[in-house]
Regions:
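Alpha-helical segment proximal to the catalytic Tyr-Lys
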Residues: 55, 99-100, 161
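Catalytic Tyr-X3-Lys loop
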Residues: 21, 28-50, 66, 90
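Short, small/polar-rich loop/turn modules that mediate ligand/substrate recognition or access, typified
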Residues: 102, 107, 163-165
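Catalytic loop of short-chain dehydrogenase/reductase
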Residues: 64-89, 94-103, 115-116
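Conserved mid-core segment of classical short-chain dehydrogenase/reductases
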Residues: 3, 7, 17-36, 55, ...
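Short, flexible catalytic-loop segment of classical short-chain dehydrogenase/reductase
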Residues: 112-123
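Short C-terminal tail/terminal secondary-structure segment
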Residues: 153, 164-181
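A conserved structural motif in NAD(P)-dependent oxidoreductases
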Residues: 137-148
Length: 181
């Protein structure tokens, strides 16, 4: 129960959601339960957290909220129907929440990483696949975890005075490439 858990927390100045589920499917064969599970995890959990924390007055005035999402929030991807639908729904959550939360000077944004140079990437992609992705980026390299962390750090800092309702792509120019998929 979120209410019981959150009631013991102090008032929060920064909240970051960096979680999610993924699955592979198409519109022609998606499973309703899988889509529902992804929507619950990737979208409704965040909305419920914001709602419950707000109702308990656990979000301080001027707080910074941030969602770590994915480039698939704004792009389509073959065989990732449920995942991209759930990530796309985050776009609406971020924009709509920014309007409501702005009344209390609370900022909410998202970062949308692409393929990152990380142990997880090396575990799930072959070196050939990684090289192919690198070739499809404007910078001919993958962003580092530090690239993501630096953007997150700024967005949740007091240096960020007026950026809200925005989603920042960190993909080394992958989306901008015409040959990326």
């Amino acid at each position: 129960n979120l209410k019981n858990y959150f009631s013991n927390l102090p008032t929060l100045e920064v909240i970051i959601w960096a979680h999610g589920l993924n699955c592979s499917d198409k519109i022609s064969n998606f499973n309703y339960l899988d889509l529902t599970e992804l929507l619950n995890s990737n979208v409704l959990f965040i909305a419920s957290c914001i709602n419950e924390l707000g109702n308990l007055n656990k979000i301080s005035t001027g707080a910074r909220l941030l969602v770590v999402s994915s480039i698939w929030q704004i792009e389509s991807r073959k065989n990732k129907f449920s995942y991209t639908v759930s990530k796309s729904a985050l776009q609406g959550l971020i924009k709509s929440s920014a309007i409501d939360l702005g009344e209390d000077n609370i900022l909410i944004n998202a970062v949308l990483p692409g393929v990152i140079d990380s142990p997880m990437t090396r575990k799930h992609l072959s070196s050939e696949q990684i090289q192919a992705v690198k070739k499809q980026t404007a910078l001919s390299r993958l962003p580092s975890p530090e690239d993501i962390a630096n953007t997150v750090s700024f967005l949740v800092s007091n240096q960020n005075k007026s950026i809200t309702g925005q989603s920042f792509v960190i993909d080394g120019g992958f989306i901008g490439s015409k040959n990326n998929l």
